[in-house]
Amino acid sequence: MNTADTRQRLLDIEKQIASLREEQATVKAQWEAEKELIHTSRRLKEELEDLRVQAENYERSGDYGKVAEIRYGKIAEIEKALEENNRKIEARQASGDLIMKEEIDAGDIADIVSRWTGIPVSKMLQSERQKLLGIESELHRRVVGQDEAVRAVSDAVKRSRAGMGDEKRPIGSFIFLGPTGVGKTELARTLAEYLFDDEDALIRIDMSEYMEAHTVSRLVGAPPGYVGYEEGGQLTEAVRRKPFSVVLLDEIEKAHPDVFNILLQILDDGRLTDSKGRTVNFKNTIIIMTSNIGAQLIQSEMEHLEGRDADAALAGLKEKLFQLLKQQVRPEFLNRIDEVILFTPLTRENLREIVTIQFNRIKETARRQRITLEISDEALMWLAKTGFDPAFGARPLKRVMQRQITNRLSEMILAGQVGEDDTVEIGLENDAIVMKKK
């Protein structure tokens, strides 16, 4: 970074500090004014109580003149002042500008508990109600073209938080079927972030690591005397530490059959006992299992899914996939799953939306380097067309955007062609992506 850039950065920081100091002065003045109002309210209440005690003492001693003077003079005057002071506090509270409160309420406690623990409070506040009502539209912002999956997951969460779900079982349990790259993992990640304000609330376990019988015990912990006993189970320990989470079991069809015995207990009772004898509560988790069962069948049916008989073809495909699933998974396990959801292959229209989502992520990364990215509609369309591969979903698109935008932008930064506060235009010329400094 050269001297001019350093000087400009220093000026920007000084302006920001000056702005923050001005904001601090305003907030401090407001805080002092509110503090004075609350202090006045307390003082007047104390004076009122003292005068009432005095009036009672004079009444017992028979001095009714003093009683009348206090009750109909001084007390009335202080009550009027207290009412006026309370009116000012209520006016600030109604406008939403109140910083301080004389008394804390249930909402304040709920907010602090949620902030400290990351656990949503049992009594739904108005803000949480709005958040839950908007869950479907929020999930649609990041997961494209999977309406049935988004609706099913949203309904399960709403049932649970409204108190209408089964209290003895997890919030929801789902099997996601579908080809690779269509949003199965992305939906789980988005759900964890939206519900618990933290992507780390997603507990992801790759079931291909549990293909052998001797590996199954690692889910609940090694038995006493075996290596790894002190570490706890990979599933139970993760949920014990984060009881409010989304549990993603990737590629469930690869797991050893004994794994389903463990999962059966979770789906039935909402709890599991680890190797140390501790009972782990799964009642506040969402269990999502993904599977690539029938991926080849889906690819072979692709041409029918985009035709006029798309709905009929999709219904037939679902039935075939369910039959394949029955061959891999025991009936008693499937009966305890809330829903088996088919993720449909992405269309060209879906990919256009995904291009915008992916580009916004690249744009945000560049913004942190103080570089602005702008892209034309033609370039977005070209990326969607080039990255479209029905067999592999959105993953080829991510590679195309990395190759065409991220890699080339990195080279421009390293070569000194682009620096802080610059704008880079991304367009299309001669059927190729071009990047120019504005």
UniProtKB/Swiss-Prot annotation:
CDD domains: RecA-like_ClpB_Hsp104-like (cd19499). It comes from the Bacteria. InterPro entries: AAA+_ATPase, ATPase_AAA_core, Clp_ATPase_C, ClpA/B, ClpA/B_CS2, ClpA_ClpB, P-loop_NTPase. GO terms for cellular component: cytoplasm. It holds the Pfam family ClpB_D2-small. Residues 1-118 are annotated as: Linker. PROSITE patterns: CLPAB_2. SUPFAM superfamilies: P-loop containing nucleoside triphosphate hydrolases. ATP binds at G178, P179, T180, G181, V182, G183, K184, T185. The keyword ATP-binding applies. Transmembrane segments: none annotated. It is found in: Cytoplasm. PANTHER family: ATP-DEPENDENT CLP PROTEASE, HEAT SHOCK PROTEIN 104. Part of a stress-induced multi-chaperone system, it is involved in the recovery of the cell from heat-induced damage, in cooperation with DnaK, DnaJ and GrpE. Acts before DnaK, in the processing of protein aggregates. Protein binding stimulates the ATPase activity; ATP hydrolysis unfolds the denatured protein aggregates, which probably helps expose new hydrophobic binding sites on the surface of ClpB-bound aggregates, contributing to the solubilization and refolding of denatured protein aggregates by DnaK. This is Probable chaperone protein ClpB 1. It comes from Chlorobaculum tepidum (strain ATCC 49652 / DSM 12025 / NBRC 103806 / TLS) (Chlorobium tepidum).
